[in-house]
């Protein structure tokens, strides 16, 4: 992308993402329908820019593959590259909004599921779902703006999540608590020094926690 921002460069377009694949997937999801108005709206905005972006990508790729730049000194390539870069920047902004809408919808659905589980015998599973949801939000917020994080609020949330996890009184709960403790340590490191290594460690430990969570069936969190 950086090379294309400077104008047309031979071969640069070939290293760009395949936006046509995403376009096909979103069109398929649109046909299947959705119950979330905000998600639908943001998805349609992404599709609108993809309808402009994909043809530009194909034009630039064809121009590059045919070596037409040898005939016009790259003039059309510069024009297409500028058009492509502008469309990608708009796509990035629209896709970020779409992703936020998806996260919001998924979070709302998860919260509803947690409340239902709390009223059943699946209290351990409810606790781990709530813990994981809250931890995901915390890690995402710290990653986005580590230097602006409210350390006191983060510590309070970490302690509350730990209490929830420790309410799962079986070996699977212990495994998750151990994995969680690694996340806690790395989050605190980021709050002390938000360098790239510490941020990477936090994400790695969080991913390990999610892996432990995914490797456990719901019933195991309520087994004796």
Write out the residue ranges for each language-model feature.
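Structured alpha-helical bundle/scaffold domains in large eukaryotic membrane-trafficking regulators
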Residues: 61-72, 103-114, 221
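A cross-kingdom marker for long, charged
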Residues: 156-224
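Extended amphipathic alpha-helical interaction segments
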Residues: 77-180
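Solvent-exposed, amphipathic alpha-helical segments
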Residues: 45, 49-52, 56-63, 127, ...
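N-terminal Sec/ER secretory leader and immediately downstream segment
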Residues: 1-74
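Amphipathic, well-ordered alpha-helical segments in soluble domains
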Residues: 18-25, 49-52, 56, 94, ...
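Solvent-exposed, polar/charged alpha-helical surfaces in well-ordered, non-transmembrane soluble domains
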Residues: 41-44, 48-51, 55-58, 82-89, ...
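Polar/charged, Q/E/K-enriched amphipathic alpha-helical segments with strong coiled-coil propensity
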Residues: 58-89, 196-203
């Amino acid at each position: 992308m950086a090379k294309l921002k400077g104008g047309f460069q031979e071969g640069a377009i070939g290293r760009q993402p395949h936006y046509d694949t995403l376009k096909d997937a979103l069109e398929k999801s649109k046909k299947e329908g959705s119950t979330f108005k905000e998600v639908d709206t943001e998805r349609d905005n992404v599709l609108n820019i993809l309808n402009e972006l994909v043809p530009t990508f194909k034009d630039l790729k064809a121009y590059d593959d045919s070596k037409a730049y040898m005939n016009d000194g790259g003039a059309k390539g510069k024009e297409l590259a500028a058009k492509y870069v502008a469309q990608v920047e708009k796509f990035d902004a629209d896709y970020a909004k779409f992703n936020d809408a998806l996260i919001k919808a998924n979070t709302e659905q998860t919260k509803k599921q947690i409340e239902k589980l709390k009223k059943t015998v699946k209290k351990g599973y409810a606790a781990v779902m709530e813990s994981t949801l809250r931890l995901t939000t915390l890690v995402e917020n710290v990653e986005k703006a580590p230097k602006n994080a409210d350390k006191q609020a983060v510590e309070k949330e970490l302690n509350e999540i730990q209490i929830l996890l420790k309410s799962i009184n079986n070996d699977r709960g212990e495994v998750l608590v151990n994995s969680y403790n690694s996340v806690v340590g790395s989050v605190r490191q980021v709050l002390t020094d938000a360098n790239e290594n510490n941020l990477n460690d936090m994400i790695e430990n969080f991913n390990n926690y999610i892996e432990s969570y995914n490797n456990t069936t719901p019933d195991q969190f309520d087994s004796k």
